[in-house]
Amino acid sequence: MNKLNINSSSKKYRTSFLVAFILFSCLISIPVFAEESLIILYTGSVLGEVKPCGCTEEEDLGGILRRATIIEKERSVNKNILLLDAGDTFKEPTEQGKLKAKTMIEGFNKMGYDAALLGEKDFVYGEEILNQGSFDHWVLSNVENNNLKQEKTIKYFLKIFNNGTTIAVIGLLGQELLFAKGQTKVKVENPGIRLEKILRKLKAAGEANIILLLTHMDKEKAKELFNLDDVDIVINGHLDETELIVNPEIAGKKIMVHVRERGQYLGKISISTDQKKIQNISNEYIPLNSKINDSQLVQSIYDKYNDETKQLFMKWLQDKKRAIKKTFITEIACKMCHRYEYAIWKKSGHSHSFKSLKKSNKTFDPECLKCHTTGFKQDGGFMSESITPKLINVQCEACHGAGSNHMKFIMRDHKAEQKKINILYKKLTEDSCLP
């Protein structure tokens, strides 16, 4: 009996082992299908902000050095990255603005942007700066400009990800914006009509799984394109000055987003796909704050921009030194009669505003000096710390205007003339504080 029991137990163990082995083998051979994660990083309406002002915490956002750091970080954890810009990279035409424009174009190339749309402000320096720049992925689907080199522009861009999913990027500029700027040399086709032609071509060729529109137009016009059945994603780069923050709109598995002003945030759209189709889609804005380290990837072009800005300032300084006029009387003179107001000013950030420029090594930057000194680029106003040391900081005359004539009337003993004192100063409003 014992012998039979032993054999029976042995068979039982062998059977259990065989069943376990078969089940384990099946588990190993079952393929696991994980959803592919696709990331779209985007900017737009940067308006030449190479580096943030940083005077206050709320303004210390943005800049190409921090942006490049986040882009590098995203690429280190996900190879499925699409990097785009939706236009208005430049601002108003100035000498320093042109240096910024060149830096921005080089930044697109260094950071590896896949495509960028031109906004209406990006034509302020003409086509020469675009033709000379190193970036050659300007996506202009509905724009014809014979002055732009053909190799610099593309009609649409196809991004093929590791899982085989293809996103078609189409760049559409609003006709009303360019016509308002008087860009008569540039021909802009109706965005809707042009889009229809491209979609027909893409459908016939079966080239794309996801349709993404980079738009630079009024919000409502972009919304009309977003509502089309074949459009999956819209990134709009034009911001209305009265509505700088526009929330994303999600409709099913479609999304429409708007950029954040001056490159202070990096937009990030996350997409999960199955069989090359969108399953889930979401958006977030990554704040480019002071916690983010500067990237070495674009440090060299930023340093070059800084050097050229300093040269620009020194050239202006040499020209200005030839004709110095004394029209500003400085805070010391104001204090004699306006002690109460002076005491309030002395406790304010205005009284030591120049320190922040020294801290960030920006005492030569014209765009910073106009807000941190008194009378910069005005007759008799601030020139440099060494030449006009008494005009550093935002003094009384920075807002009220030069006080030399005011002082002359005060020194005279004529009541009739003293009545004119108030006329000499401009009325101060909120606009007086804006650069």
Task: Label each region the model flagged.
Residues 1-13:
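N-terminal secretory signal peptides that target proteins for export/translocation
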Residues 19-29:
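Bacterial N-terminal signal peptides
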Residues 21, 62-64, 148-151, 304-315:
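Short coil-to-helix leader/linker segments, especially the first N-terminal amphipathic alpha-helix
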Residues 33-290, 297, 337:
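Acidic, metal/ion-coordinating pockets
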Residues 44-52, 278, 283-435:
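Short sequence/structural segments immediately N-terminal
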